[in-house]
Amino acid sequence: MQPVHAHREPAVHYRVAAPSPHNHLFTVGLDIARPAARQRLSLPVWIPGSYLVREFSQHLQGLRASQDGQPVALKQTTKNTWVAEADPKRPLHLDYEVYAFDPSVRTAFLDRDRGFFNGTSLCLRVHGQEDRPHALDLDAGGLPRGWSVATGLTPAEVDARGCGRYRAQDYDELVDCPVELGPFWSGSFEACGVPHRFVVGGAPAAFDGQRLLDDARRICETQIRFWHGDGPPPFSHYVFMLWATGEGYGGLEHRNSTALICQRQDLPLKPGQAKAKPAALKATDGYTTLLGLISHEYFHAWNVKRLRPAEFARVDYDQENYTGLLWFFEGFTSYYDDLFLRRAGLIDDATYLQLLMRNLNQVLQTPGRHLQSVAQASFDAWIKYYRVGENTPNATVSYYSKGALVALSLDLSLRRDGCATLDDVMRELWTRSGGGPIKEADVARALKRLGRRDFAAELAAWVHGTDDLPAVALLKAQGVKAEPEKAPLAQQLGLRMADNGSALVIKTVLRGGAGEAAGLAAGDEWLGVETPARRGTPAQAWRLRKLDELPALLGPQRRFTALVARDRRLLRCAVQLPDDEVTAFKLSPGNSDTLRPWLAP
């Protein structure tokens, strides 16, 4: 029988270095204390939270194995799997490199200014030892001078910069804790007694870090109290890793951290700067969008990282992991992200309703909502959501956007009935599952138990059906003013446009719209318009550079000819604007007595 401390020693040990960042290569050393005779190793094909097979092994190169300095036979058996013929009585060592030049939050990146990696991109999985302790070394000597380390991993022995050894209880924890490297800005705060760190790379000199910390703290405290009241969250510390860049936006959730990307211009600036964010945030402010992203990824620490689909009880890193519940885990998170900005006091009722309006109109202007249910969209995420094409809006619906409307509709239905709220349902699911895997039946049971009636009809229609949700009627009943208004011109035309500055290009032709009836196609370059002769007005032809020029050129006319270029041919397409204008909705505060319990409980 071994002493207890022996079980704490890492069975699998990685050493990651970046000796030459300009070549975008991380070097990795891997030591396995007790390998199998035919030790299998593999690199994941996907990263949890991003539902697409990304083939991370395409960037792994120079893999070699040895024992006591002598080469060991290594055979590749699949696209992402290798077998080493090892002596089980001796440690097995492997060396390899990983090319890292993807600036997204999903993979790995390395240049002279910054390093970042997810374990799914760098750390080979040692089959048979996934549940044993793992260690990761980030030695100061293997990193550029002046770089620091930020990660959610537990430090075992590190210096002031964070360089040194980190531990994970198993492979799942190791790859669920990304690592940020570089000369980043770093700040910290406590939320409900729990330490939080916020690091930001790529920020300008006028960046107002203190405002970001204060606003993030309010979001975190509001969410912790939402789930636990005065109790602690399910993590002992949390790390935000934000990279500010010229272009880009996104985030990926992890068990006690998140990796985020925003545009540099969206960061708050210190007071007195020309473009400093005003104290009162608007729905159109980039900083409001950033705070919504922070709120979204933080909420995921509960909803998807712990409370998760039953199919994700144990992750299979070698293939797709299907679930029909992303409408709940991503959609409900999308409902709560902006709502928590309101409840934290960062935005007012009017601003929140403008954010909600944007999501509502986006769904209403997506023809695919009548073809694909949100449950099917969840299951199809692996082949559709991340593979956007010109027909995507016609054939699919977003489980983020429509899932958020499902959450809204359920919440307002519960509030109308007067027995419970969706907040109560979320906490009920957390308590009864122990913060673990759930099925759709668990959601239905919680709704029935707390709502004191069966919600099977709503789930069948809203989740598994393709009819529009009663969101507008429910909003009106809750005290929201919902007024129809004219949709944007492109939507009236049944088009989505891409304006690259020098050409006006059709990106998507929406099903059933005026553009489809006219014979316009995705990829057409819209050059100009011809208007027919009218009494006292001759026929005219105009160059069209921006779509918003069209109303002035048409005047009261509803019919015109679009001049487009397609495959080096010039075509005329007769367009008839619809008599019944496509509508959107404008939301604004109405009855504060009924709004207050929902928006600011």
Question: Where is each model-derived feature located?
Answer:
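Juxtacatalytic substrate-recognition/specificity segment
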Residues: 185-326
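Extended, low-hydrophobicity, Ser/Thr/Pro/Gly-biased non-transmembrane segments
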Residues: 95-181
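Short, hydrophobic/aromatic-enriched beta-strand segments in well-ordered soluble domains
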Residues: 28-34, 43-45, 84-110, 134-142, ...
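C-terminal recognition in membrane/secretory proteostasis and scaffolding
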Residues: 337-338, 347-601
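Post-HExxH zinc-binding segment in Zn-dependent metallohydrolases
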Residues: 258-265, 306-307, 318-369, 563
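A surface-exposed beta-strand-loop module
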Residues: 18-19, 49-110, 126
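Early extracytoplasmic/domain-onset interaction patches
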Residues: 2-46
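Zn2+-dependent metallopeptidase catalytic core
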Residues: 56-64, 131-150, 154, 163-172, ...
